[in-house]
A protein has these predicted regions:
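Formylglycine-dependent sulfatase
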Residues: 2-4, 17-405, 420-441
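Sec-dependent signal peptide recognition
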Residues: 6-14
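Short beta-strand-initiation
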Residues: 11, 347-349, 409
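Long, internal low-complexity/basic segments
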Residues: 25-28, 35, 64, 272, ...
Length: 641
């Protein structure tokens, strides 16, 4: 009897242990469906013009996030953030596109899921914006192709993490392709009754009301509808495979829509994204929200990787800067989300943003450059030229001119609750002085804490980093960041004497920001011009180019051009990209630079033949060569008529 009792106890313990093991290894499947270039223009977000039944149904079954934000208003920095769980500005992957490396231990968070037995698939876009992209792909994905699918896992019981990237709403489809191509390849996918009528399209106040703009906005909505059909197909496959009851589903876009004033802008129209997360009943305990609910909790792309790891029971690496917003032991919510805008293709820029649940603060560090800078690839779209035409004819309201004009405010502040389209800048409002100060301080604290490498010009960054990654150099605290930050913060605010003082610094990056500060001023003295002329041989080419630009902008073009034409034929294509863009923006008054720009163009074409599609991402100098060609073509076209 005693023996039987002991045997029964042993058997019970074994069974309990077996159940514990089963419970320990059971993991949810994760499905990510990512739309390209799409704002929350969905029925479930209150857009009555949108036709999105499949996504709307998912929202009724899941949780809708009303305050979800990208980290950048363009794709490749966003994807760098999503795959690493780190701010691109801390990795030096903030430019589009970047050739800097990241540390080898940053394999991509799906690699950690693979370590735990997950089958991971990516269909199909990568664009991780780093020299290490091949290593990330190899480590992260069991399958990475346009046929990658959870259905290809070797065992049906194996948990999966699958991504489907839908290009249907991408800027190429919504505004760049010729309209005839859009009709053939996108509009043909949707029912005739679902085609959006241009006459009925709701135009935001920052868009002029013309037939062309109406047609293009209706076209964008058609792209969203076609994308919704694809979402429905994927969700149907999941249901048909009897997997919906064990799969957590994320639907989101990589940033705002590809239309003007959306993509590339730190305004809510460029950064606010739809996010819907579905939890089956089995895994409902991992979400604090009930199905069909809406939450206004702030979430950012930097948090997605750590959230997936937390949902699947994987410990977050120390290097991840994001914090989980779902899963066990989530006790705090975000107070702020942060955004960055840097070089995109040939277009140079640097701006930063901070947003809380109500207010958006933007700091433009190159306020002498407008929102609507000329840019080769999007300029293939007719809608861009409609904006140029109306701006030239001065047929724009103040809300439209904010985007189309040649300059930007140094600081912007918007009450997104009462002004969701960001039309009224409150930065100079006495009533909002304390709010402005709080968000400005938060911005300074964030770029300092995260060591924002975007404040280093690219050519200088390459010199500084050497064989180390930007992350490693930033974490070592060997960069004199506070000195650089303080010089940049003066742009648009400080006096001429402060910028001249910065030009005398031993730090080349401080000198660089001193030159930009002078460029951004409406006028400078003859004394300042004289000092700039003396400094034209600065050993840093980035600084030299900006000194020349300051002279050119302030009517000393003849003194400036020799330095620029020298730089445009430099051996380093990062220097060439910088110089070519500077010459391009100077336009007709830089006519003597034509031979140098023709030479730079010929070199660029040899490196990257012009028949290579602009959407094809190539490593190293090949992408830079495309950006050089963009600027050279645009500049030389001025003189063809």
């Amino acid at each position: 009897m005693v023996c039987s009792y002991k045997s029964a106890v042993r058997l019970l313990l074994l069974l309990l242990g077996y159940c514990v093991v089963l419970q320990a290894v059971e993991k949810p499947n994760i499905l990510w469906i990512t739309a390209e270039d799409m704002s929350p223009t969905l029925g479930c977000y209150g857009d009555t013009f949108a036709t999105t039944p499949n996504i709307d149904k998912l929202a009724k079954e899941g949780v809708l996030y009303s305050n979800a934000f990208a980290n950048a208003p363009v794709c490749s920095p966003s994807r760098s953030c999503l795959i690493t769980g780190c701010y691109p500005t801390s990795l030096s992957t903030q430019q589009m596109r970047s050739g800097f490396s990241i540390p080898k231990h940053m394999r991509g968070f799906p690699a950690l899921l693979r370590d735990q037995g997950y089958f991971t698939t990516n269909n199909v876009k990568t664009d991780y914006n780093t020299a290490n992209y091949k290593e990330i792909i190899e480590a992260s994905w069991s399958e990475n192709s346009n046929s990658a699918h959870w259905r290809n896992r070797p065992e049906s019981s194996q948990p999966f993490f699958s991504i489907f990237n839908l290009m249907t709403s991408h800027q190429s489809r919504s505004m760049v392709w010729p309209y005839k191509q859009f009709k053939k390849e996108i509009q043909s996918q949707i029912l005739a009754e679902d085609i959006h009528a241009p006459a009925d399209v709701p135009l935001p106040p920052y868009y002029p009301d013309t037939p062309l703009i109406r047609r293009e906005m209706a076209r964008y909505y058609d792209c969203v509808t076609a994308m919704d059909i694809q979402v429905g197909i994927i969700l149907k496959q999941l249901k048909n495979d009897n997997l919906k009851d064990n799969t957590i589903i994320f639907f989101f876009s990589d940033h705002g829509s590809g239309m003007p004033r959306h993509k590339r802008a730190l305004l809510d129209s460029g950064m606010h994204v739809p996010l819907i997360i579905y939890f089956p009943k089995k895994w409902q305990h991992l979400s604090p929200y009930k199905p069909g609910s809406t939450t206004d909790s702030l979430v950012s792309f930097v948090d997605f990787a750590s959230t997936i790891l937390n949902l699947t029971g994987v410990i977050n690496p120390i290097s991840m800067q994001g914090k989980p917003f779902l899963g066990p032991n989530v006790t705090t919510k975000r107070s702020y989300v942060y955004g960055h805008r840097d070089r995109v293709d040939e277009v140079r820029d640097l701006a930063r943003s901070v947003r809380d649940s109500r207010y958006l603060y933007i700091r433009n560090y190159m306020p002498h450059l407008g929102y609507n800078q000329p840019t080769a690839w999007p300029d293939k779209g007719e809608i861009r030229h409609e904006f140029y035409r109306l701006a030239k004819e001065k047929k724009m309201t103040p809300e439209q001119w904010h985007f189309a004009g040649p300059y930007r405010p140094v600081e912007e502040l918007y009450d997104c609750l009462n002004d969701p389209r960001n039309l009224k800048n409150l930065a100079k409002s006495k009533k909002h002085k304390n709010i402005l100060g709080r968000l400005r301080s938060e911005h300074i604290q964030h770029i300092t804490d995260t060591v924002d490498l975007g404040f280093l010009p690219e050519s200088e960054a390459w010199t500084m980093f050497g064989k180390r990654s930007g992350w490693e150099l930033g974490q070592s605290k060997s960069i004199p960041f506070n000195e650089i930050r303080n010089a940049a913060v003066q742009v648009g605010i400080a006096s001429e004497s402060e910028f001249l003082k910065n030009l005398e610094s031993e730090n080349s990056v401080v000198r660089y920001w001193g030159a930009i500060g002078l460029t951004a001023k409406k006028t400078i003295s003859n004394k300042a011009k004289g000092i700039l002329k003396i400094k034209l041989k600065d050993p840093s080419y980035a600084t030299r180019i900006e000194i020349a630009n300051a002279l050119a902008v302030h009517n000393e073009i003849n003194e400036a051009l020799p330095a620029l034409t020298d730089a445009v034929n430099h051996e380093n294509l990062i220097v060439v990209t910088h110089a070519a863009r500077t010459i391009e923006l100077l336009g007709e008054k830089a006519a003597v630079a034509k031979p140098a720009m023709k030479k730079a163009l010929a070199r660029a074409i040899k490196i990257r033949p012009p028949e290579t599609p602009a959407t094809v991402v190539l490593p190293g100098d090949k992408d830079l060569a495309m950006f050089v060609a963009f600027s050279c073509h645009a500049f030389l076209a001025i003189f063809e008529n």
